[in-house]
């Protein structure tokens, strides 16, 4: 018989808000609107620990994740998990019967690959986007979610263009959009990505033929923007399309400076 040291009373009786496992790599399949996505996400699962309890049962957290993932990849029940947030909620629900808690969080980090069409040659280019989904069970039993996307684009500087007869410097820009909302609110990650990507001077592509390169450069010079412009546009579009608390962060990797530029706002 094993000694359950986790159930002992700790020397310092302080409650902990988040205790669990992080950087757990696994596999998951999601059926979203008839299209199946396969992910290799990094998972983080945490629960609260009361002051009178020394620790948590780590194996039970992993077991809950494994069970939820196994259910998701079985063909006959794949449709049960229609989104990453549904998968996260399933992990929490399975955890409830294994590890008592008042509050729990599941965070899922992964990449979403979306096919895009190049601007001139009209070829298909598969573009990667960093996404993160958080599912939070509050102490009152309610659920909320946090959705984050990270998109790479570019900007052309309007100040240099206005002072150099149309010549300017260009740089890669990174736009991040976060939305915190009630769990029931439907917010597709793809739409969040579209909001960010359409706010740059021009989108970037993995595959570009010469005619596409020309189209991208011409598009950038026809649409010069400061990093502040990009942040404001993302924020305005997000407020128009989504309900929830919005956080926008844009970083411009400056090409003529040794520093970068940041613009950030939130609701």
From Swiss-Prot:
> Site feature May be catalytically important: at which residues?
157
Task: Return the cofactor note field.
Answer: Binds 1 Fe(2+) ion per subunit.
A Pfam family matched in the record:
GCHY-1
The Swiss-Prot or TrEMBL record lists the needed cofactor(s) as: Fe(2+)
Q: Give, as in the UniProt entry, the pathway in which the protein acts.
A: Cofactor biosynthesis; 5,6,7,8-tetrahydromethanopterin biosynthesis
Does Iron count among this protein's keywords? yes
Catalyzed reactions: GTP + H2O = 7,8-dihydroneopterin 2',3'-cyclic phosphate + formate + diphosphate + H(+)
Q: Which InterPro entries match?
A: GTP_cyclohydrolase_FolE2/MptA, GTP_cyclohydrolase_MptA
Report any one BP term from Gene Ontology. Answer: tetrahydromethanopterin biosynthetic process
- Molecular function (GO) terms listed? GTP cyclohydrolase activity; GTP cyclohydrolase I activity; GTP cyclohydrolase IV activity; iron ion binding
The UniProt record lists the keyword Hydrolase: yes
Q: What disulfide bonds does the UniProt entry report for this chain?
A: none
Entry EC number(s):
3.5.4.39
* Gene3D superfamilies xrefs: Urate Oxidase (3.10.270.10)
**Keyword annotations of the record:** Hydrolase, Iron, Metal-binding
HAMAP family per record: GTP_cyclohydrol_A (MF_01527_A)
**Similarity-based family:** Belongs to the GTP cyclohydrolase IV family.
Q: How does it assemble?
A: Homodimer.
Record function comment: Converts GTP to 7,8-dihydro-D-neopterin 2',3'-cyclic phosphate, the first intermediate in the biosynthesis of coenzyme methanopterin.
Q: What is this protein called?
A: GTP cyclohydrolase MptA
* Source organism: Thermococcus kodakarensis (strain ATCC BAA-918 / JCM 12380 / KOD1) (Pyrococcus kodakaraensis (strain KOD1))
């Amino acid at each position: 018989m094993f000694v359950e040291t986790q159930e002992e009373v700790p020397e310092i009786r302080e409650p902990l808000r988040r205790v669990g496992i992080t950087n757990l790599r696994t596999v998951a399949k999601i059926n979203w609107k008839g299209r199946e996505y396969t992910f290799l996400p990094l998972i983080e699962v945490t629960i609260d620990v009361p002051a009178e309890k020394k620790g948590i049962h780590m194996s039970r957290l992993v077991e809950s994740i494994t069970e939820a993932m196994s259910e998701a990849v079985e063909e006959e029940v794949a449709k049960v998990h229609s989104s990453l947030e549904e998968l996260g909620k399933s992990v929490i629900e399975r955890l409830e019967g294994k590890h008592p808690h008042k509050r729990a969080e599941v965070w899922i980090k992964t990449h979403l690959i979306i096919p895009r069409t190049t601007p001139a040659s009209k070829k298909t280019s598969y573009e990667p986007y960093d996404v993160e989904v958080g599912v939070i069970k509050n102490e009152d039993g309610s659920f909320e979610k946090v959705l984050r996307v990270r998109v790479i684009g570019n900007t052309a500087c309007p100040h240099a263009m206005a002072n150099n007869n149309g010549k300017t410097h260009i740089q890669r820009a990174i736009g991040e959009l976060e939305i915190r909302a009630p769990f029931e609110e439907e917010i597709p990650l793809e739409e969040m990505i579209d909001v960010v990507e359409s706010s740059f001077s021009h989108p970037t592509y993995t595959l570009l033929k010469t005619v596409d390169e020309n189209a991208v450069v011409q598009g950038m010079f026809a649409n010069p923007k400061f990093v502040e412009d990009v942040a404001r546009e993302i924020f305005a579009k997000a407020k128009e399309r989504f309900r929830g608390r919005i956080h926008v962060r844009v970083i411009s990797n400056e090409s003529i400076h040794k520093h970068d530029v940041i613009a950030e706002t939130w609701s």
